């Protein structure tokens, strides 16, 4: 249902089908991978997702951060020795700079593709874990709105 249809149509179908699904069973949506689509689907009762976006984007030098997307092949990162996502606790952000990752990508070193993919997988794990925590606190809708405003504003691809 999620592959090829406009997002608004997908959301409409989710809203229609949600009441028809068993309450105690997990709800899976295939092929949904943008942060916006994932959070909007969670809002509509979806529990699980899978998509190629984290790996495909990583193989193309694009990484997801809590502030937005980055295209690390861009020349603007050639002398940027800061972390991809300051304060994000994963191996990529702790150990590699934007400039170093850009260098790896531009010389065709496979490590660069792997590190970008690891960053993206870490980001999406953080996104869903944080969404779950915000649901438990009763503040999901406010957090989602704040996150998406910040994230979509900073799409640096």
Across the structure, where does each feature detected by a protein language model lie?
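Glycine-rich phosphate/ribose-binding loops and adjacent secondary-structure elements
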Residues: 1-84
């Amino acid at each position: 249902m999620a592959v090829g249809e406009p997002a608004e149509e997908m959301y409409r179908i989710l809203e229609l089908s949600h009441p028809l699904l068993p309450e105690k069973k997990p709800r899976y949506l295939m092929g949904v991978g943008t942060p916006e689509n994932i959070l909007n689907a969670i809002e509509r009762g979806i529990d699980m997702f899978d998509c190629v976006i984290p790996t495909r984007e990583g193989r193309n030098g694009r990484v997801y951060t809590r502030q937005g997307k980055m295209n690390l092949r861009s020349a603007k990162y050639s002398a940027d020795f800061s972390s991809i996502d300051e304060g994000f606790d994963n191996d990529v952000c702790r150990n590699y700079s934007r400039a170093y990752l850009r260098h790896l990508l531009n010389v065709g070193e496979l490590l660069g593709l792997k590190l970008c993919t690891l960053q993206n997988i870490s980001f999406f794990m953080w996104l869903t874990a944080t969404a779950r925590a915000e649901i438990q606190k009763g503040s999901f809708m406010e957090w989602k709105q704040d996150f998406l405003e910040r994230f979509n504003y900073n799409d640096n691809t």
